[in-house]
Amino acid sequence: MVMDDLFQRMVSCVLPSWRAFIDEEVKKPYFQALLEKLKALKATIIPKPELIFRVFSFFKPIDTKVIIFGQDPYPSPNDACGLAFASNNSKTPASLKRIILRLEKEYPSLKQESSWQQNFLLNWAEQGVLLLNGILTTTVFIRNAHKNWGWEEFNCNLLTFLKNQNIKPLLVFLGVQTKNFVVKSIGNVDGFEHLSYPHPSPLSGNLFLTNPNDLFKTINNWLKQHNQKIINWAVVKNASFDQLS
């Protein structure tokens, strides 16, 4: 199969171990239809093609510890970067700002002066945290524009791909809508343990910040119970991390 320019740009950063999965998906009718819809768009695709599969550029499938699901990318071209909740913008999006506040509440040692680098979440991505949007693209300035375009089937097949290799990371759903979207639209979550937590958006009120149950510590406790190395949740690499704080 001759790959078109759009697909080549999409997979330009993908690690070979993930390419094995994606190269099988691109042969399927649903993915060919998805590519045609993306190519037919007159408006800008968010994120840009080179970043759509960026989530698959940091570690091998076998090293996937946790999947934190978002719904779809930030619709602003200055924010979307291919990682759910992360941003390339120097201004921290509201949801990410609350994620950082929650993190500092659970780990006071991580409290630091604001830095534009905190928005990237690269330290998480480099430790086996798959920051995965249920829908990987949208149209500039329009939320949820590519629902039912095929990304749901892609992510359903992704979970099958992991499960078939006996890779069963913890699935983390932030918000009821995200959980319902993943369970109903993507499906195939049987066999995976999962954790549900309020959404960090200000539209959800203060539930994310005031929830008495820990989020990040719960994830690390799960990893310890499964004999895996815990995540250093520092949002900026090399920041001090005291797991007991």
From Swiss-Prot:
It is found in: Cytoplasm. One of its GO terms (molecular function) is uracil DNA N-glycosylase activity. GO terms for cellular component: cytoplasm. Pfam families: UDG. It catalyses: Hydrolyzes single-stranded DNA or mismatched double-stranded DNA and polynucleotides, releasing free uracil. Keywords: Cytoplasm, DNA damage, DNA repair, Hydrolase. SMART domains: UDG, UreE_C. The keyword Hydrolase applies. One of its GO terms (biological process) is base-excision repair, AP site formation via deaminated base removal. Signal peptide: none annotated. It is an enzyme of class 3 (hydrolase). Its EC number is 3.2.2.27. InterPro entries: UDG_fam1, Ura-DNA_Glyclase_AS, Uracil-DNA_glycosylase-like, Uracil-DNA_glycosylase-like_sf. The active site is at 72 (proton acceptor). CDD domains: UDG-F1-like. Belongs to the uracil-DNA glycosylase (UDG) superfamily. UNG family. HAMAP family: UDG. Excises uracil residues from the DNA which can arise as a result of misincorporation of dUMP residues by DNA polymerase or due to deamination of cytosine. This is Uracil-DNA glycosylase. It comes from Mycoplasma genitalium (strain ATCC 33530 / DSM 19775 / NCTC 10195 / G37).
